[in-house]
Amino acid sequence: MARVDFWHTASIPRLNIPALRMSDGPNGVRGTRFFNGIPAACFPCATALGATWDAHLLHEVGQLMGDESIAKGSHIVLGPTINIQRSPLGGRGFESFAEDGVLSGILAGNYCKGLQEKGVAATLKHFVCNDQEHERLAVSSIVTMRALREIYLLPFQLAMRICPTACVMTAYNKVNGTHVSENKELITDILRKEWNWDGLVMSDWFGTYTTSDAINAGLDLEMPGKTRWRGSALAHAVSSNKVAEFVLDDRVRNILNLVNWVEPLGIPEHAPEKALNRPQDRDLLRRAAAESVVLMKNEDNILPLRKDKPILVIGPNAQIAAYCGGGSASLDPYYTVSPFEGVTAKATSEVQFSQGVYSHKELPLLGPLLKTQDGKPGFTFRVYNEPPSHKDRTLVDELHLLRSSGFLMDYINPKIHSFTFFVDMEGYFTPTESGVYDFGVTVVGTGRLLIDNETVVDNTKNQRQGTAFFGNATVEERGSKHLNAGQTYKVVLEFGSAPTSDLDTRGIVVFGPGGFRFGAARQVSQEELISNAVSQASQASQVIIFAGLTSEWETEGNDREHMDLPPGTDEMISRVLDANPDNTVVCLQSGTPVTMPWVHKAKALVHAWFGGNECGNGIADVLFGDVNPSAKLPVTFPVRLQDNPSYLNFRSERGRVLYGEDVYVGYRYYEKTNVKPLYPFGHGLSYTTFSRSDLKITTSPEKSTLTDGEPITATVQVKNTGTVAGAEIVQLWVLPPKTEVNRPVRELKGFTKVFLQPGEEKQVEIVVEKKLATSWWDEQRGKWASEKGTYGVSVTGTGEEELSGEFGVERTRYWVGL
């Protein structure tokens, strides 16, 4: 009923009950190690997959996720995440598919179906209202039952209809005053009884807060091990009748059922972790990346670009691969492709680069620029039980690393005596340019950076709390030193593990023995960078700006403070557009919405999210027209932060956050209040054009009770009226009649994707159950209400064309269940 470590349940050899392995998660199967782990496939982030609106693609993604899980020896994947982006600022917003429960639930259900067809258990998370990072362990989400049902529980409900998952993970937070991991109404009454689901409920890591209340509420498994709340505490609760034995039996039975469920995989205990990286997997990752790219704007059809004309690439996201967000979603990918690499690989003419601006939150990692004493790329990582001041220290471990950032939460070495240990990281740096270099150190623990035995950064005393490493780390402390081009310098980071820190860790879950990050960059004038980019752009025949966010800016453990791009980025984009407005394409990468004060100047804009291993190739495929963009926004992009419905209620205030927008989340709010967004939910252009015609709505006869089996079927003719093959996403919206309660103007109820050659026409069919298409949650009755009346139907897609129809509901009926 609790784990033995971070990733395994306890085995009972005498009963032939094996341990089970679990692994994150949202956009790739990391395996059992955050630190120095086996590389894995990195999928586009969830908002990117949400932008595909492609249930079949998500099924394929789930199947590959299953193969990756088996390769890592993992029985259970801790994903997908299907929380709702009630604010653009949520640190984990990129982990969820959409702001709408129907889009999110259908995609998640197909993802889980593909995963579980491989025999691997899927885990829907985080159940429920885990929609912010601020005080996430303690905050109480104050939400009406109507909003809880119609918005936040809906994606879980719809996903379960498609694929009852083997597992569900509870959220960290409270809902209306009670932590979800001990909330009987949510776990037992709704999830198990009303939805008739019989899988395993686990807590999020350190998201169990009681013994008896959690057991009695229905929490089967405390995560992670070793237990804090079970073991002897649970034995005492049983002996004192705080927990009945039959309740304990139910919790154990669910764990054993999961053991039996995954048993056909045949994964042995302590299975070795392997890398796949197969050609067909790379093809799928590239296709997913390309199909997620949203064409936001394309005046004068300046896209697609010409491969045979010179190209100037500008921007901070060009030569790095922003492949994923931060936190649980992060992993070590098999490889990455930057946008610059993707463009260069396709172009047949010259491709130049100008930095334009830097956008790092912390200094770029120094590790890739270092060499070991014997000339290998990277640095040595030497572990000791004693601090550097101790004479004749004994070396207990030595590793060779490339990445100068590591979260040691799962680092184990039997020669280490305790959580308190010390590491010397040593490498040699030969700069290519002379100048003053800034160096930065961020630690969970302590760190001192020395260059040729001179202390440049001291992060060992008077430490300041930062946000890195799930909020465990210090801020990045910096120092500077002048370096000469061509001269080699010895760089050493003296690191002490987490217990050596003087940070106040009360209220913070400290994951393991610590973490480190060290980086460096040559000081350079921002004005100089922008001016150089503007000068080059003014003479260029084709310009692509790559800008946006990275895992530093969007990460678990920390919400964003604003929607703006990193400092200097907007100025750079604006000035480049002024210099060459007719030939400049702006490509942004972020997992959630950003402000664009310069957008009126741009003729072409694409949004490319965090695109996984193949992000650069996927972007280039769209920019050059090898893939016709078909993606649609899964979240609304407001003009400014103040326009979003959660603006007044997004953070914990005295331990609670009020979901004051009620059911008016995302597009529901903008349409109800006539607040025009920058780009609406469902927006996305194509290189071709489509027509939609001949909408027909058919319904089945009504029964006395409203159950499954009363489908509403919409058929429509879709034709590719352009000259380029492409895919159209057909969206079905339902407009409710006037009722006794306020309802959204319209709500998405179904969608489908169809690929058409130029001139080709197909009939498209979307089927929705009447109860799902018409109902709202009646708090007085505690039931869904499908009210009598005439319901409007709207069918939309690429462009402004909208088809309208209607259907009737003859009598008001109420229902509960899945």
From Swiss-Prot:
Residues 374-534 form the PA14 domain. PROSITE patterns: GLYCOSYL_HYDROL_F3, PA14. It catalyses: Hydrolysis of terminal, non-reducing beta-D-glucosyl residues with release of beta-D-glucose. It comes from the Eukaryota. Its EC number is 3.2.1.21. InterPro entries: Cellulose_deg_GH3, Fn3-like, Glyco_hydro_3_AS, Glyco_hydro_3_C, Glyco_hydro_3_C_sf, Glyco_hydro_3_N, Glyco_hydro_3_N_sf, Glycoside_hydrolase_SF. The keyword Acetylation does not apply. SUPFAM superfamilies: (Trans)glycosidases, Anthrax protective antigen, Beta-D-glucan exohydrolase, C-terminal domain. It is found in: Secreted. Glycans are attached at residues 176, 453, 472. GO terms for molecular function: beta-glucosidase activity. Pathway: Glycan metabolism; cellulose degradation. Belongs to the glycosyl hydrolase 3 family. This is Probable beta-glucosidase I. It comes from Aspergillus niger (strain ATCC MYA-4892 / CBS 513.88 / FGSC A1513).
